[in-house]
A protein has these predicted regions:
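Solvent-exposed soluble domains appended to multi-pass membrane proteins
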Residues: 1-198
Length: 198
């Protein structure tokens, strides 16, 4: 079981029980009138810390990316077509995506984006570990993080097929992801005090 990242059978059984609960929930909802007119959203709030090395590069275990890896499922067989996607997204993208699915006008005053709009420059998610001071960005190829309390930064592959970079390319990626992580961090801090509803 440890090969698949589970530390115990109890942990594995908790995952299996979650799947069972989703099934029972949907089976019950299918019997209700609202089912054909509802978008169900399932998302985890955190992943599992553990050895993910069987499936993912070292960063998933050593930099604890597995704790950030959660499922996201939009389910509405009468309203949306099935898709299987694997790009890097964030929990902050959920509300703008739902609003976009509803095809109603809305003002997005968050950092999130509509995942289905096709208007994406870059697939990325911000990470933060408050206690240790690490902020970072994971995208479809790399995980970059830096410590805001000390001069320390890391750039590691986030996928097995991550690109091989020259030193100049690596420096360019580091610089870009450093600027992006700082921009998101500072924007989120600003929004905390200034992004008030009317």
């Amino acid at each position: 079981m440890s090969k698949y990242g589970f530390e115990s059978s109890k942990e594995f059984n908790a995952f299996a029980y979650t799947d069972y609960c989703f099934q029972k929930f949907i089976e019950a909802a299918q019997k209700e009138k609202y089912f054909s007119n509802t978008i169900f959203v399932f998302i985890g709030d955190h992943g599992v810390e553990g050895d993910a090395s069987f499936f993912y590069p070292k960063a998933w275990t050593e930099q604890r990316l597995s704790e950030e890896h959660v499922p996201l499922l939009f389910y509405s067989p009468h309203l949306i077509n099935p898709q299987l996607r694997n790009e890097t997204v964030s929990q902050i993208d959920v509300l703008p995506t739902i609003a976009g699915m509803l095809q109603q006008p809305y003002v997005n005053s968050t950092l999130g984006r509509n995942l289905l709009s096709g208007n994406k420059k870059e697939n990325a998610a911000f990470t933060i570990y408050h206690a240790s001071g690490w902020i970072g960005i994971v995208n479809d190829h790399f995980y970059y993080r830096k410590n805001i309390h000390m001069q320390k930064e890391e750039l590691v592959p986030s996928t097995a097929d991550s690109l091989t970079l020259t030193i100049a390319q690596k420096d360019s990626v580091k610089r870009h992801l450093s600027e992006l992580s700082t921009a998101i961090y500072e924007t989120a801090r600003w929004m905390l005090f200034h992004n008030k509803s009317k």
